[in-house]
Amino acid sequence: MNTEMAYLVGMVLGNGEIQRGNRETTITIDIPYKNLYTDDSKDVAVYVRASVVDIRAIIEPLVGRNLTVSQTTHSTKLSFTKNNEEYVIRELLRLITRGRHHSTMRMSADLFNITSDEKISLLRGIADSTGYIRKSNIAFGQDGAHRVYIEIPANWYMVIDISNMLKDVDVPVQTIDWGHPNFRDGKLVKYNQGKPNFWKKEHQIKIFANEFLTIGFNILHKQEALEKYSEELLEFIDPEKTHKFYWEKPVRIANKPIHPGENDSSLPNEIRGRHFDSWTELAAFLGYVQ
């Protein structure tokens, strides 16, 4: 393991797919664009295209020069195909467990034993492929409270893996917006409007911008926004207030009504039928604890 391999693992975990054949395996990584333009009206696609040069420098020593890059209006895709016996393929399959699509993958236990620098590199790979920061990502409507969002569609356990790895490098999660009925429709507003499945959305891990500087991005427009919004945050908020894990501060518990979606078949077995009044209750139940 090295930081380059860790970064590649992170990109695959964040938004990748592994297609394994009898002799060869193809890895595809998608870098989607939430918006076509940055907050200061710069073309996101141009920034990502420029960033691919740096990403190639990290990945190509592992995969060779057969890295293919394709771009559409809303995403950039990186892909490569290697023999099943190649080191990079064997390592990816060893370090990524349970699935071949990012929606079902898990981090292997070995990844929690790598060095801090490697963990940071892995988390940066995740952030480059599925994280973003925009002016609208502000907490509580509070001036300067900018946050990075890491979006995880469907994969409940990856949320916990990422949160625990962030904890390992001393980066607190500010909150998790779970794709769960108790949080996405906690007052049954949408349910009562005839939209019973409104809550079925991606999970969002939210981290204060200044805390995420430890991780950073290799995607240029994301890194520029991170630095800008971190500076703005620190003009309004004491960094001691952002550097707190949920178990280090009072947790607001709001008694929520029972939602019929709590028994939905799409929920993992261990939480199906359970009710949660706080995001921290669900996070702790699934394994994000002190």
Model-predicted segments: where are they?
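Internal intein/HINT superfamily modules and their associated LAGLIDADG
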Residues: 1-290
